[in-house]
Amino acid sequence: MNSIKFPVLDRTTKNSVISTTLNDLSNWSRLSSLWPFLYGTSCCFIEFASLIGSRFDFDRYGLVPRSSPRQADLILTAGTVTMKMAPSLVRLYEQMPEPKYVIAMGACTITGGMFSTDSYSTVRGVDKLIPVDVYLPGCPPKPEAVIDAITKLRKKIAREIYTDRIRPQQGNRCFTTNHKFFVVRSTHTGNSDQQLLYPPPSTSEISTETFFKYKSPVSSHELVN
């Protein structure tokens, strides 16, 4: 897993001097020391916990689990995300330093799973809240699949240009620390009828009344940023 090759790093002179760029050196240092923040809400998280044991021993891949998002550069979401938990998840993501990455683990995290059918309180895909780098399907995915997802993420980091990643996030922000929840009419068809709106971060705010008080009864909620 540590044998990811860099074309620029492989070029050496006769005096064994490595010729590289600052961007490639930064990518090389980050891909071998990912610090994940674990956000597990359901059974998929138990499969990730298996990696901690001696059979898989994910420490040999440079993974150091952190309990604070401010010390992590990778968040791994596993399990169902509800409307009530959505602001907390986005707030945790915003607290992570750049550059940061997301792995969506399991069917419930990627699409809402079986809990999203005729459910008014389930987010149908965590990518409606935060940008996802690697999708890991399964119900639940095996520990070997988690290692494969981390390997693919490492390869992505190896080819990454930092400025190209930051610029789209700053220009097209689809997530903010503050959120708005609106109550709208919805049909229970099993399809994803949740939509995303992208207001400026300065105009978004969390209102307590939005969470607990509603002017008229409705059948479901819809999440918008």
From Swiss-Prot:
Belongs to the complex I 20 kDa subunit family. [4Fe-4S] cluster binds at C43, C44, C108, C139. The keyword Manganese does not apply. GO terms for biological process: aerobic respiration; electron transport coupled proton transport; photosynthesis, light reaction. Coiled coil: none annotated. One of its GO terms (molecular function) is 4 iron, 4 sulfur cluster binding. It comes from the Eukaryota. The keyword NADP applies. One of its GO terms (cellular component) is respiratory chain complex I. NDH is composed of at least 16 different subunits, 5 of which are encoded in the nucleus. This is NAD(P)H-quinone oxidoreductase subunit K, chloroplastic. Binds 1 [4Fe-4S] cluster. NDH shuttles electrons from NAD(P)H:plastoquinone, via FMN and iron-sulfur (Fe-S) centers, to quinones in the photosynthetic chain and possibly in a chloroplast respiratory chain. The immediate electron acceptor for the enzyme in this species is believed to be plastoquinone. Couples the redox reaction to proton translocation, and thus conserves the redox energy in a proton gradient. Keywords: 4Fe-4S, Chloroplast, Iron, Iron-sulfur, Membrane, Metal-binding, NAD, NADP, Plastid, Plastoquinone, Quinone, Thylakoid, Translocase, Transport. Its cofactor is [4Fe-4S] cluster. Its EC number is 7.1.1.-. It comes from Draba nemorosa (Woodland whitlowgrass). Pfam families: Oxidored_q6 (PF01058). It is a peripheral membrane protein. It catalyses: a plastoquinone + NADH + (n+1) H(+)(in) = a plastoquinol + NAD(+) + n H(+)(out); a plastoquinone + NADPH + (n+1) H(+)(in) = a plastoquinol + NADP(+) + n H(+)(out). It is found in: Plastid, Chloroplast thylakoid membrane.
